[in-house]
Amino acid sequence: MTPAARRWPAAGGVVGPVAFAAAWAVLGRRQAGYSPISDAISQLAATDAPTRAGMTAGLALLGTGLPLYAVALRRVVPGPGWAAAATTGACSLAVAALPLPASGDRPAHAVAAVLGYASLAAVPLLAATPFARRMGAGWKAPSRLAGAVCGTCLAATTLGPASGLLQRAGLAVGHGWIAASAVALLRRQDGGSA
């Protein structure tokens, strides 16, 4: 397999999270009455939201990028971390396909979101030791910390009025770890040092 062919799946771990974060950051500023401190990102993709198309596109890019990243992770790093990455990607696509209604809740959306959060926090936790073995010992502690912070922030979204901020913090840490590890995989596949 050529280096370019090995490179593009890992790039999904950068492109997907960056596109998703850009979508919620830009669209959240544009939607009147929306608060990134107290409102969930899913509200930007709700059936009645004027930002629905853009936020759904961001979710779709995340949902396709993460399974590609999972392929690259599986090629280099043993263990179940890749499966957690693929799961969070699939859950992102499910969240996009099951938008919040104009009023009320959508239980299937909530289930997809919770599974997506749990699998996102699991990626760095499950990959910590094998990733450190392959890519350098310096990855182990930060990977565990990223998984713990991601999971804690996302679990804390149920506790109070700053749920939007906690959601963004948890997602930023989890997606940030994925993007950093994807860059390390890209460098390794090109023959560079990790």
Label the predicted regions.
Residues 192-194:
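Beta-rich carbohydrate-recognition and catalytic domains
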Residues 4-40, 44, 48-187:
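Hydrophobic, aromatic-enriched alpha-helical segments typical of multi-pass transmembrane helices
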